């Protein structure tokens, strides 16, 4: 159990391998590199959101507005492209909007001291409303071919956006694991008061986490538009829950201070892989959310039981040195007393 708790990435990877091999027993065509790349392509949006959610959850916060942020950013991208702006300018404006939206969430939480769940529930409606005001409730269509080209395979069946997602994930994993910048996120989530005493600017760390989360939501909006080719008026709905679920599946603690980006990426891949397996098994699409939720609940229950067991073990080890082992005479006396008790009962 200790190995599982300390190696959540390996556990998530093992789950992915099992979910890849078992359906292959039903259909040998499923066991192919094409299947892996297809699932990865579908998982890119969720992976980007999981990276952002990781930053927020490490600081012991949560952002439920990220789906609305994704939709709002995708709408801005579509509106600007249809207005004649170039693709780089539209993408840059979209990224800035996402960062600003995340920054606003961070200000509400870190400076105004509003609980994260309450603040982001408010901005969830706000950003969704802005999105609908821009579109008038209509879909955005007629996006330029240059945007769709971003999702076209370029090497090993992976698109330019796919390679960008992989590089970004590795970069964020390195920043969190190897730099003081990343360690501040862990310190803030693990022990807020202790981090402050060590000189960590915890308010700025939390604002940075929400801002990065908003930037990742903007990138997810760009990927969504490039893959789909149009922007529905419900873009991003429900993605916030999937992003949080991916992080939890990958070992990110809801209590903050533990987990890795790699684990979150694997969790996002696993959730997307479930959808592909359901398609293979010809299970109706409306079962997807039910089964994904069932898997998440199972992981949460297992994770909770695992943490309780580890905490009991740690307490036992902590106080073991204060409990002296019984002497041979004490052990023999205890044995005789137990035998006499058994005779009396008999």
From Swiss-Prot:
Keywords: Cell inner membrane, Cell membrane, Membrane, Transmembrane, Transmembrane helix, Transport. Pfam families: BPD_transp_2 (PF02653). One of its GO terms (cellular component) is plasma membrane. One of its GO terms (molecular function) is transmembrane transporter activity. It is a multi-pass membrane protein. The chain crosses the membrane at residues 13-33, 38-58, 71-91, 92-112, 114-134, 154-174, 212-232, 248-268, 283-303. Its main location: membrane. It is found in: Cell inner membrane. The complex is composed of two ATP-binding proteins (LsrA), two transmembrane proteins (LsrC and LsrD) and a solute-binding protein (LsrB). Belongs to the binding-protein-dependent transport system permease family. AraH/RbsC subfamily. Part of the ABC transporter complex LsrABCD involved in autoinducer 2 (AI-2) import. Probably responsible for the translocation of the substrate across the membrane. This is Autoinducer 2 import system permease protein LsrC. It comes from Salmonella paratyphi B (strain ATCC BAA-1250 / SPB7). The lineage of its organism: Bacteria, Pseudomonadati, Pseudomonadota, Gammaproteobacteria, Enterobacterales.
